């Protein structure tokens, strides 16, 4: 980005950050060359104008038409209404916009334009199904509290209908008017090979479209309607940034990944697939028609709607308890009593199952469980999980504001850096005299109070989500594997005082997979005088400027909303967290009381 003078202006800085976020969320197709760098100057110009005027950044995404129709006795989805797949995709889009709003105060919005009226007749989708899908999609976004999404239909966008349809009859009328426009004044000749993006869409249709007697004619009709639709979008939303869910070269429009990594390795959209929770608790988007129904069961939501697929496993069979196992966004899992059941006693929870599940998905949240003789039970259940790691203060730490015990910023209301517990927990090698970091494997939390109205979130960032994002924009995994980082924080009553050199990538002590290790640099400028101390971090053997740049990129990945689950505590919550697989942090809070107990287990 060109500098105005020696240093970038605040506007240039902000535009550069926004472009970095857009770049990070884009899909790089294996079938089409990625030419995002060619589009970046035009994007920079558009964003500079938007930011300079103090206007919100607006994106437009044609998508979410309806669930793919059944082909004979096969169906890629679980039904005709939104389910867990749409939930995750909407959360991803809202997180994308929220990331921009965090650095650009006027905010950011993704306008979702439903494709239903564009393709519904060609794919033989009843208006009633498309209308119900759209209405339920809006309800889902509202129930999730997603504030950066808007929903509109093409006719309303083009101004040919006065407002959004509220009834099926109004919707059918709007659909008719929209198709007349697309097949009339907006219709254009189309060549499947006219450019890279059209070729990619044409190739996609070769396998994605339902079987037809004349496939080429069917595909041509879809491409022609799509080209007219693109013209409608371009003419109706000139000040927006065009997003896409089709494979493209990322010029003129930016193809989005709608799911966190590694959820959708096959680039399946939510209306062409279903969420599958595998036996190891990992989450994938799959073509439901390819799933072995003897191995998987359909899980319904509280309304009885088919919601996701789950592989049959004793991991999800907690004897005597009727439970929901719900994937969290973008990582982790919540376990809670099914509606009409519970609360269950924490004393009765099988900690062997908890340990297995927590090693498969992190963090693991238990909500809706009671505990009677508090500390005695908490300590006893921790022992069932594994060997408790002791600290100078004992085994259970009461994490609340406490100025009488110096643990850096742990027992304050301050924000904390992203870290993993025990990085500064050390033992001295008897032979070499070297100080060795001995972090615990598990964290076990029990929330006692969470009355703060704002802030006080705990963020958990999973290596399973972060490592797939390593690459040219940050640093490739194999390069990072060769590097070490150096860190130091001053000694306090529990830890610190020794300079450490540690690898960025380690092998998980139980699963054997790669996991990321780091501590967010925390300079004195982020500390509260008299309350907390800085933590110094740099890449071993690198010049300071290059080290700072890499540390900034890695820190940005930890905060990426596709990587970090943002937990708002409720009194009574239990969290079991794989400390080797994740990092965590706390956001600052001002009012209210926040307290939980923490114990470390190996």
From Swiss-Prot:
It comes from the Eukaryota. Isocyanide synthase involved in the biosynthesis of isocyanides (or isonitriles), a class of microbial secondary metabolites. The presence of an isonitrile moiety within a compound imparts unique biological (cytotoxic, antibacterial, and antiprotozoal) and chemical (transition metal coordination) properties and enables synthetic and biochemical applications. It is an enzyme of class 1 (oxidoreductase). The keyword Oxidoreductase applies. Gene3D superfamilies: Clavaminate synthase-like (3.60.130.10). Its EC number is 1.-.-.-. It comes from Aspergillus fumigatus (strain ATCC MYA-4609 / CBS 101355 / FGSC A1100 / Af293). Transmembrane segments: none annotated. One of its GO terms (molecular function) is oxidoreductase activity. Keywords: Oxidoreductase. SUPFAM superfamilies: Clavaminate synthase-like (SSF51197). This is Isocyanide synthase A. Belongs to the isocyanide synthase family.
């Amino acid at each position: 980005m060109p500098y105005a003078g020696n240093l970038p202006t605040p506007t240039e800085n902000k535009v550069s950050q926004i472009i970095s976020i857009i770049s990070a969320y884009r899909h790089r197709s294996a079938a089409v060359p990625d030419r995002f760098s060619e589009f970046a100057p035009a994007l920079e110009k558009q964003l500079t104008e938007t930011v300079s005027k103090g206007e919100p950044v607006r994106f437009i995404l044609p998508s979410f038409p309806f669930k793919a129709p059944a082909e004979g006795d096969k169906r890629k989805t679980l039904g005709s209404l939104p389910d867990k797949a749409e939930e995750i995709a909407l959360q991803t889009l809202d997180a994308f916009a929220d990331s921009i709003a965090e650095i650009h105060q006027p905010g950011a919005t993704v306008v979702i334009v439903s494709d239903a009226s564009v393709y519904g007749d060609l794919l033989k989708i009843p208006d009633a199904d498309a209308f119900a899908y759209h209405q339920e999609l809006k309800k889902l976004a509202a129930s999730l509290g997603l504030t950066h999404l808007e929903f509109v239909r093409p006719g309303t966008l083009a101004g040919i209908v006065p407002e959004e349809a509220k009834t099926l009859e109004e919707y059918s009328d709007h659909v008719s008017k929209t198709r007349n426009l697309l097949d009339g004044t907006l219709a254009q000749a189309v060549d499947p090979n006219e450019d890279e993006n059209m070729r990619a869409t044409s190739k996609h249709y070769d396998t994605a479209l339902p079987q037809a007697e004349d496939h080429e004619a069917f595909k041509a009709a879809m491409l022609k309607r799509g080209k007219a639709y693109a013209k409608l979008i371009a003419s109706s939303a000139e000040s927006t940034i065009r997003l896409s869910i089709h494979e493209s070269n990322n010029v003129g429009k930016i193809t989005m990944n709608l799911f966190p990594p590694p959820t959708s390795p096959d680039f399946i959209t939510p209306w062409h697939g279903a969420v599958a929770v595998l036996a190891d608790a990992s989450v994938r988007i799959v073509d439901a028609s390819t799933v072995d129904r003897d191995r998987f069961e359909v899980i319904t939501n509280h309304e009885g709607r088919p919601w996701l697929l789950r592989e049959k496993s004793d991991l999800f069979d907690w004897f005597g308890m009727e439970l929901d196992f719900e994937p969290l966004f973008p990582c982790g899992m919540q376990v809670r009593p099914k509606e009409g059941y519970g609360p269950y006693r924490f004393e009765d929870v099988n900690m062997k199952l908890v340990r297995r599940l927590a090693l498969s998905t992190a963090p693991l949240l238990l909500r809706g469980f009671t505990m009677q003789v508090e500390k005695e039970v908490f300590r006893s259940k921790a022992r069932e999980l594994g060997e408790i790691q002791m600290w100078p203060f004992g085994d259970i730490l009461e994490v609340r504001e406490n100025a009488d015990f110096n643990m850096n910023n742990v027992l304050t209301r301050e924000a904390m850096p992203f870290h993993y517990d025990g990085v500064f927990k050390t033992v001295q090698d008897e032979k070499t005299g070297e100080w060795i970091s001995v972090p615990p494997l598990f964290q076990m939390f029990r929330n006692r109070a969470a009355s703060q109205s704002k802030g006080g979130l705990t963020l958990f960032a999973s290596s399973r989500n972060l490592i797939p994002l390593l690459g040219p924009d940050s640093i490739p995994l194999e390069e990072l594997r060769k590097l070490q980082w150096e860190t130091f924080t001053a000694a306090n009553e529990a830890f610190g005082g020794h300079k450490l050199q540690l690898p960025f990538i380690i092998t998980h002590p139980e699963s054997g997979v790669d996991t990321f290790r780091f501590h967010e640099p925390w300079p004195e400028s982020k500390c509260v005088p008299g309350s907390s101390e800085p933590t110094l971090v740099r890449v071993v053997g690198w010049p300071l400027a290059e080290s700072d740049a890499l540390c900034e990129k890695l820190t940005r990945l930890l905060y990426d909303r596709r990587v970090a689950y943002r937990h708002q505590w409720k009194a009574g919550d239990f969290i079991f967290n794989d400390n080797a697989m994740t990092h965590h942090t706390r956001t600052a809070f001002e009012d209210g009381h926040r307290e939980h107990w923490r114990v470390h287990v190996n």
